[in-house]
């Protein structure tokens, strides 16, 4: 891998967006998935703060932080879909999440890849509780972290968004379709 290129690209985009306060944590080794990458990236922070995570292979158009973020321990955005290549939500009452699965369709509520945790300390504690049986296809994914939080009494919610607010670009075909769209 060529290290340094990604941070320069990110700095350029941050400047373009006018973001004044930020940190870039560059990982120099492969990880066992997105959840481990996030865990490693947060290790040196001693103050607690909320975190938003978004999959790099998805574009979320016109995102605005929802008010629900101040009223729950975590949330994930979903769209109505099908297939087995998503994270899924088993819904409860009032948009609560009973459990999540990875690549295992338990409903038609598919995560678009946007995840919120009110406390990065909660996320880290839940990640530390994972073991090899929590790996899916050799990776630790973000969505299943919510199951630990839910078992510990956390209030995790989902928000439904329109498929029109999302563009996918994780496969070659999705990328080609995205290029044609723009």
Question: In which residue ranges do the predicted regions lie?
Answer:
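Conserved alpha/beta core of the MobA/IspD/sugar-nucleotide pyrophosphorylase nucleotidyltransferase superfamily
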Residues: 111-182
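Conserved beta-strand segments of alpha/beta enzyme cores
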Residues: 21-23, 96, 155-157
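Short beta-strand-to-loop acidic/aromatic patch adjacent to the donor-nucleotide binding site
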Residues: 48-59
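Short, surface-exposed amphipathic charged segments that create phosphate/polyanion-binding patches used
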Residues: 37-44, 90-91, 173-177
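Conserved core of the sugar-phosphate nucleotidyltransferase
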Residues: 8, 12, 59-136
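Conserved beta-strand scaffold positions in the cores of enzyme catalytic domains, especially
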Residues: 24, 74-75, 158, 166
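Conserved N-terminal catalytic core of the sugar/cofactor nucleotidyltransferase
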Residues: 1-50
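A short acidic, often aromatic-flanked loop/helix-cap motif at beta-alpha or helix-coil junctions
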Residues: 29-34, 84, 164-167
């Amino acid at each position: 891998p060529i290290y340094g290129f990604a941070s320069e690209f990110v700095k350029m985009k941050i400047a373009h967006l006018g973001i004044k306060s930020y940190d870039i944590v560059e990982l120099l080794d492969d990880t066992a998935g997105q959840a481990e990458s996030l865990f490693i990236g947060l290790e040196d922070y001693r103050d607690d703060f909320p975190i938003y995570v978004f999959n790099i292979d998805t574009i979320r158009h016109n995102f605005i932080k929802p008010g629900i973020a101040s009223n729950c321990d975590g949330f994930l955005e979903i769209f109505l879909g099908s297939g087995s290549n998503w994270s899924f939500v088993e819904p409860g009452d009032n948009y609560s999440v009973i459990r999540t699965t990875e690549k295992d369709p338990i409903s038609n509520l598919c995560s678009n890849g946007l995840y919120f945790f009110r406390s990065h300390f909660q996320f880290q504690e839940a990640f530390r509780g994972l073991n090899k049986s929590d790996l899916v296809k050799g990776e630790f994914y973000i969505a299943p972290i919510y199951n630990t939080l839910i078992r510990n009494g956390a209030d995790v919610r989902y928000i439904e968004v329109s498929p029109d607010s999302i563009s996918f670009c994780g496969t070659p075909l999705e990328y080609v379709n995205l290029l044609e769209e723009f």
